[in-house]
Amino acid sequence: MHLQNSDTQALELQANTLTWQAWQTFWASHLGKEVLKVEAEYLAPIMESLRGYHVLSVGSCPSKPLLENCTIKHQMEWRPNFDLAEHGSCLIADPSHLPLPNDSMDVVLLHHSLEFFDRPHALLKEAARVTLPKGELIIIGFNPRSLWGLTRLLPKGLQAEPLQVLKSAQFISQNKLLDWFEFLDLKQEERQLFFHRPPCNHQKPLERLAALDKRLGKKNWPLAGIYLLRIKKRVGSPLRPIVKKPSPSWLPAQPVSSPTRTSLKIQKEK
């Protein structure tokens, strides 16, 4: 076991920040806005059904539209650095070494983050570690067996600017995810496939093709562009971090009002 040296931490921070900023270009595009809108619609009933005290979002964009209907009031979200933290409930850390206790989160949302980071398996393991037994992980990602998966194979010069971020993204197959879930003692309980429109960044064609989503939206067509997974953490041996975590800086989250369970205490770094 060893501590990450300061040079490694600095490089990872810089890489995460640059990747985050590249994804913001995508989410600000016509296509990105439409994707986020549809994802929020599919997440809404799930968020309304959640129970617990603490939810953590690790993703490639601000989580406000995704957590809008969440019944869990104590909400934290990851950011790559302090400059990108909009409020006091942002967690600033290497996402594969979260400064959180084992079994401390009722729900962890991974929104396109397995595609975002260089070590998706390490991120998933860390998310599982901080999730309570019988807690939930919710994973949203792009389906590699779709037009979205084919688009990332195009030469960079043929891709529209908002889509260039997909070139470096890691599209992970369902079979590989199932292998990871088994290794981490996780059980997939629900899988939804949606967004049947091609990755086209033109507003009018996107609006015209919206009928495809209405026609195929609830059929889990295997070539749909986006998947949503609900994962349950089984009760078993606790997962431990691979290495001893450094002491990263983070902003403290606001405490939950009147909890019946001891609230998570995160101390501000001095």
Predicted features along the sequence, with ranges:
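A short acidic, Gly/Pro-enriched loop at the edge of an enzyme's catalytic core
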Residues: 96-108
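Short alpha-helix
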Residues: 154, 167-191
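Class I SAM-dependent methyltransferase SAM/SAH-binding core
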Residues: 41, 45-98
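Conserved class I S-adenosyl-L-methionine
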Residues: 136-164, 168
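Conserved catalytic loop of SAM-dependent methyltransferase domains
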Residues: 187-213, 222-223
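Class I SAM-dependent methyltransferase Rossmann-like catalytic core
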Residues: 2-48
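A short glycine-rich, Lys/Arg-flanked "PGG" loop and its adjoining helix->strand segment in the class I
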Residues: 121-136
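C-terminal lobe and adjacent flexible extensions of AdoMet/dcAdoMet transferase-like proteins
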Residues: 211-270
